[in-house]
Design a protein with these regions (language model features):
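Conserved ABC ATPase "signature" region
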Residues: 98, 102-125
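Conserved ABC ATPase signature
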Residues: 129-136
Length: 246
């Protein structure tokens, strides 16, 4: 089932083109990775989908609803975990989750907070202040917070940036579980290993344009110079954006 559709989305600030004629769809339970150099438009696209920003033109449908006209209807169906920790720093993890659950009027919120704390294995540090959390703990807590409202779509901006490899792998496992729950995910990332491990499809952006969107192996095949070349996703990506390493 299709949960998201972008049709000719354009974003411009004064004379600067941020996004140009972006069109793609997202299916239920699908994980899509947005790849592109800095300034490619990845975060701008996430903000438009989340409702934090608006396109100048184009159509955005979320769960079959026109997001520009009826955003309130889909607000609880969409979660957005930003790169920076924006949780209430003076609260403990549990307090922050309870606060958010009450704010969004989650039914049986105390039970659901306990359940998600257990699900994300946060029991031993649920009473720790947000400001005292490590990067990996904070990222887990933010993803858990977003899932309290049971969104159909989750947006993750650089979900494992700055984390140690072992912690990064733990975050990946949590993201993989979302797919099994039928949640559709869009991530932005600079890690090719992360994109290849997590994503069903990859979208490559450069200067606001969508250069390609397809399965990882097909993306590699498109940029393969001959059938005997052992091409990595990183090499394919660099060829797409015109910066192949020698």
């Amino acid at each position: 089932m299709q949960v998201l559709s972008l049709n000719k989305i354009n974003k411009q600030i004064k004379d600067k083109i941020i996004l140009k004629d972006i069109s793609f769809t997202l299916e239920e339970g699908e994980i899509l990775g947005l790849l592109g150099p800095n300034g490619a438009g990845k975060t701008s696209m996430m903000k438009i989908i989340s409702g934090l920003s608006r396109a100048n033109s184009g159509k955005l449908d979320i769960l079959g609803i026109d997001a520009d006209k009826e955003r309130a209807k889909i607000k609880s169906q969409l979660g957005f975990v930003m790169q920076d920790n924006n949780m209430e720093r003076e609260f403990s993890v549990k307090e922050a989750l309870l606060y958010y659950a009450r704010l969004y009027k989650v039914k049986n919120y105390k039970y659901k907070v306990e359940k998600i704390i257990s699900q994300f294995e946060m029991n031993t540090w649920q009473d720790r202040k947000i400001e005292k959390l490590s990067g990996g703990m904070a990222r887990k807590a933010m993803i858990a917070r977003a899932l309290l409202v049971k969104p159909k779509i989750l947006l993750l901006d650089e979900p494992s940036v700055g984390l140690d490899p072992d912690v990064r792998y733990d975050i990946w496992q949590e993201i993989k579980k979302l797919k099994n729950m039928g949640i559709s995910v869009i991530i932005t990332t600079h890690y090719m290993e992360e994109a290849e491990y997590l994503c069903d499809k990859i979208a490559i952006l450069k200067q606001g344009e969508l250069l390609a969107i397809d399965e990882v192996e097909k993306i590699k095949q498109i940029m393969q110079k001959d059938e005997n070349e052992d091409i990595t996703l990183e090499k394919a990506f660099l060829r797409f954006i015109g910066k192949e390493a020698y």
